[in-house]
From Swiss-Prot:
Keywords: DNA-binding, Metal-binding, Nucleus, Repeat, Transcription, Transcription regulation, Zinc, Zinc-finger. It is found in: Nucleus. GO terms for biological process: regulation of transcription by RNA polymerase II. PROSITE patterns: ZINC_FINGER_C2H2_1, ZINC_FINGER_C2H2_2. Residues 214-224 have a biased composition (Pro residues). A zinc finger (C2H2-type) spans 29-52, 309-333, 339-362. One of its GO terms (molecular function) is DNA-binding transcription factor activity, RNA polymerase II-specific. This is AT-rich binding protein. The keyword Cell division does not apply. Its main location: nucleus.
């Protein structure tokens, strides 16, 4: 078979003991000595070095086949076994079995194969670019449709919402005649403008501003100086002291003027302590309402038939099954501290807090408060 010259991809010519085979997307080299297929030229080069000692000039004796090598030194190396085998180096470029035309054909085949691979790669790249362009076009079309739909919906809403919105206040409010006349004139002008415009859409809002006409001033208080004091049952009117009334009818008009002056001074003098008493009673009522003895709300029946007591302090709204528990809970809302410590000035809302204070601060155990809690 000889030494074929193989043209590699890097345009280097090698003389090797093998045959170059090209098929589809790959090529391989078949060793002529052992018929082993190798994928790359480097592997084939290593194979002939390690297995057949090609570069070392030693031809193995186990090669049974008569090779048609074009080297006389190889024939001498393959002599009978009784003769001494001399190490003769083998020349690489000595055989010229394959002509230059065949080498050109092999080179052309390799170039054609590389060109085909490049074309396939270019085609794949073009297909990928086309797919990307199609996807981008689809996205653009979808966005355009969405924008168009949004514009149409906004236009429809504007067309449907166009018109004149008239907001009229309730008739129970008192309006002056001038405001009513002005509002009627504005409504008539708006209606005339809308009829003249025709297809022109406009949003007009007319507000009837209501003005509360102040009523007549209250009458002045009565001349007699009567003091009003709050009582448990209601309001009582106390007449002035009889000594301050003075003589009536004897002095004529002059006497009446003097009596009026004396009455005004007496009313100013007596009004101050009476007002102080009224303020003290109001504070007492406020304290009673803030204390824990305030009247609780009545029991409320639930769906399951049970009666619950609800705390009516502010927005608390907690429910209790027993009234005593609810009264104990109301101490939380109260500002009153009924339980005072005998050892210091501390005070507490609940007796348990006082007991804890005595145990921690004064080391007193088992001593209860002498103060009796208020009965609910």
């Amino acid at each position: 078979m000889g030494f074929p010259r193989i043209l590699s991809k890097n345009n280097k010519i090698y003389t090797k003991l093998g045959e170059f085979c090209l098929s589809g997307d790959s090529f391989w080299i078949v060793c002529h000595t052992c018929q082993e297929e190798l994928q790359t030229q480097d592997a084939f080069w290593k194979h002939i070095q390690d297995e057949h000692n090609f570069l070392h000039g030693l031809a193995k004796q186990e090669h049974g086949r008569n090779s048609s090598y074009c080297l006389p030194d190889v024939d001498a190396a393959t002599a009978p076994a009784n003769q001494t085998a001399l190490p003769v180096p083998l020349a690489l470029y000595h055989c010229a079995k394959y002509s230059e035309e065949e080498q050109r054909e092999v080179a052309a085949a390799v170039e054609l194969h590389e060109a085909q691979q490049q074309q396939q790669q270019q085609q794949q790249q073009q297909q990928q670019q086309q797919q990307l362009q199609q996807q981008q076009q689809q996205r653009d079309s979808a966005e355009l449709q969405a924008v168009t739909a949004a514009a149409e919906s906004s236009a429809r809403s504007n067309n449907s919402g166009s018109g004149i919105d008239i907001k009229v206040e309730p008739t129970s409010l008192t309006l002056t005649s001038e405001i009513q006349v002005a509002a009627a004139a504005a409504a008539a002008a708006a209606a005339a403008g809308a009829a003249a415009a025709g297809a022109v859409t406009a949003n007009t809002t007319i507000y009837h501003l209501s003005q509360v006409v102040p009523g007549p001033p209250p009458p002045p208080p009565p001349t007699p100086c009567f003091v009003t004091t709050p009582t448990a049952g209601g309001v009582s009117t106390t007449p002035p002291h009889p000594a301050l009334a003075g003589p009536v009818g004897a002095g004529g008009n002059g006497g009446n003027g003097a009596n009026a002056t004396v009455m005004q001074q007496a009313c100013g003098t007596l009004g101050m302590p009476l007002l102080g008493v009224a303020a003290g009673q109001a504070e007492l009522v406020a304290k009673e309402s803030n204390s824990t003895t305030a009247s609780a709300s009545s029991a409320v029946s639930s769906d399951d038939g049970e009666r619950w007591y609800i705390c009516d302090y502010g927005a608390c709204g907690l429910k209790f099954k027993y009234k005593s528990r609810m009264e104990l809970h109301r101490v939380v809302h109260s500002k009153e501290r009924r339980f005072n410590c005998d050892m210091c000035s501390a005070s507490f809302k609940q007796s348990c807090n006082l007991s804890t204070h005595r145990k921690k601060k004064h080391s007193l155990r088992g001593i209860k408060s002498e103060l009796l809690p208020q009965r609910f």
